[in-house]
A protein has these predicted regions:
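Extracytoplasmic catalytic/substrate-binding loops of multi-pass membrane glycan-assembly enzymes
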Residues: 42-47, 227-228
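Helix-turn-helix DNA-binding elements, focusing on the entry/boundary residues of the two helices
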Residues: 176
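Glycine/proline-centered hinge or cleavage motifs at structural transition points of membrane proteins
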Residues: 183-185, 197
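Contiguous mid-protein beta-loop-alpha structural module that forms a pocket-lining wall or clamp
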Residues: 212, 221-227
């Protein structure tokens, strides 16, 4: 009886959440899609709105630039997150538990605040920029433009790759690695032939989430882009 009550309670909560999701997320998206392909005067199917959108170079170039930044940021985030997860899982490093916590916490900061923090560090008048200028006499342009956007996005997003890959490595059977080592495979060969194929689904899942987060972020390019 108690089990049935708990089941009904959680089922009711799930249905309530589903209703809110349909009303406030699914329905507005369907309505926008409907209005984008229906002519309000003739009520006929039309693609004029999409034609006008892609005919303007400004919108088209913005979409291409966003895609370019997103792909580069996702690749760099994967290059950082994958080896870091493997090293922290495979090598006993003092304080690795605290480092793992810091990596996860760094992902929790909002992108807008993270971008502003990087400007305070590496902007034209940033803390690190002023130190380099005062010691070496080198005046840096700061962390602006395409390279700055990609760098900030990658450093903001790599913890997601790290968490996914780290979870996959935690569930791997160590006997596979030991068997490969007994067969004479080098560390690089073990990573390339055994570890990487097994964690690839988690890596792709994390990369997809990074791609969506970066592509939908407006605050970071607005602060760092400077017209890119």
């Amino acid at each position: 009886m108690n089990t049935a009550k708990k089941f009904n309670l959680w089922m009711g909560i799930a249905l309530l959440i589903l209703c809110f999701f349909i009303i406030f997320v699914v329905y507005p998206l369907i309505l926008i899609l409907y209005k984008s392909v229906i002519d309000p005067e003739s009520s006929k199917l039309t693609l004029d709105y999409f034609t006008k959108f892609f005919a303007r170079k400004y919108y088209w170039s913005t979409l291409v630039n966003s895609f370019y930044v997103t792909v580069c940021s996702t690749i760099i985030a994967s290059v950082i997150g994958l080896p870091m997860a493997y090293v922290l899982r495979s090598v006993k490093i003092p304080g690795s538990k605290y480092l793992n916590i810091l990596i996860v916490i760094s992902y929790l900061s909002p992108p807008f605040i993270g971008a502003y923090a990087w400007i305070q560090l590496l902007g034209r008048n940033g803390f690190v920029t002023q130190i380099i200028n005062s010691i070496f006499g080198v005046k840096l342009d700061g962390i602006y433009g395409f390279a700055g956007i990609v760098l900030v996005f990658a450093l903001q997003s790599f913890p997601l790759i790290y968490m996914y890959v780290s979870g996959a490595l935690k569930n791997l059977d160590n006997s596979l690695n030991e068997a490969a080592e007994s067969l004479g495979l080098t560390a690089f060969q073990r990573v390339r032939q055994i570890i990487l194929p097994l964690v690839m689904p988690s890596l792709l899942a994390g990369s997809l989430l990074v791609f969506m987060r970066v592509f939908s972020d407006f605050g970071t390019p607005m602060l760092i882009g400077e017209g890119f």
